[in-house]
Amino acid sequence: MRVLLKDGSVLEQGKWKQTDVAIENGVIVARGEQLSFPAEKVFDCRGFALFPGFVDVHVHLREPGFSYKETIATGSAACAHGGYTTVCAMPNLNPAPDSSEHLAVEEALIQGEAVIDVRPYASITMGQKGEGELTDMAALSGRVCGFSDDGRGVKTAETMREAMQKCKEADSIIAAHCEDMSWIPAGGAIHDGAFAKAHGIPGIPSESEWKPIERDIALCRETGCRYHVCHVSTKESVALIRQAKAEGVNITCETGPHYLLLCQDDLQDLGRFKMNPPLRNKDDQEALMAGLLDGTIDMIATDHAPHSAEEKAKGLRGSAMGVVGIETAFPLLYTYLVETGKMPLEMLIDRMADAPRRRFRIEGGMQVGDKAAVTVFDLHAQEKIDPNTFLSKGHATPFEGWEVHAACRLTVCGDKIAYNALSRKE
């Protein structure tokens, strides 16, 4: 199939340039003004911005095992609606992808249902228990984007050391959910701060995150493993990672839109404000923003975690942990970081597209020769975040009702038109 994106605006070295993008059989074959390119599908992108498709290295697509929350079909459609062309799917599934046979179940669903590039993680431990026998990383590494027990921390230094050694031998990456449950009281639901104390809710202390990061940095220094920290939320974590990078440790990390735009001051006793790790203090939020700007935090990942409406209807105490975010990430960050002057647009695109591609060795982009990974946005939109417009099964977002000034109009992934809200000439 031949596709032409006509008269879109591309940001190059700080300047907008009107550009056509020609795609043939899923590959970018030409870029330039007024291209002569006979195409089966021509999309008029005049007035819209063209970006490399976004990459999220931390999403929960829930299938196999929990299709009442999300499916590969609904989740990948939601990703395309958010401008994403590649996502890495976490392994807290049933069965957990801890063997060739179990991984094949997820791969078959991806092959049959995904409208974008979905890359599975395998679990670090058998059954994704955070302890005990490790998965056969050497056998699985060629079929996965990395290894994670996300949703659980790896419990002991001995288990993590062995995992790092095997991961390094397999030339893969560990994406670590850093959470030491020994720090968390029964019923821990939100940050151990003023809101928790005022409302009598058991709190989750910052130590539960930064202590295992501190442990793993030492192990990473020892083993040389490629290591990535998921959903960083505390100022101590940022400081530890900044120092480790200065020492040459092979470490990267991510944070999420909700940690950049919200803190515990914004909490309401609603399930849509409950996620793990929780919203922290204002000084944690400020440290995350500083880390994002100085490169300590390499990328933005949504930790898109859909649940059923019933599971999110029990307030902060009783609701399941997790919020959705894949459809709102760029509109929110563009509106509240770029338009407010807190962050250049080029940096936001790097943190959402280029940096995760580099670290996780993911092909695709907008240059000639790339596998086509392009998203088209209207940066003059005036919309309010409305969960009823989501393609995800999950609707729990702390940003419901927020005004945003960006809207996805088209997403192209390889030879697929993954999302289309443009009028089309044929």
Predicted features along the sequence, with ranges:
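Histidine-rich, glycine-flanked metal-binding segment
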Residues: M1-G53
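C-terminal cap of metal-dependent C-N hydrolases
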Residues: G8, G315-G318, V368-E426
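Metal-associated gating/positioning segment near the N- to mid-region
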Residues: R46-E113
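Histidine/acidic residue-rich metal-binding segments in metalloenzymes
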Residues: G132-I300
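Divalent metal-coordination and catalytic microenvironments
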Residues: G8, G26, G47, H58, ...
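His/Asp/Glu-enriched, well-ordered alpha-helical/loop segment
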Residues: A198-R226, L293-D294, D298-I300, A305-F377
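Active-site loop-to-helix "anion-binding N-cap" substructures in soluble metabolic enzymes
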Residues: P64, A89-V115, A122-V144, R152-T156, ...
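Alpha-helix-loop-beta-strand connector modules within alpha/beta enzyme cores
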Residues: S100-D117, K166-A176, T328
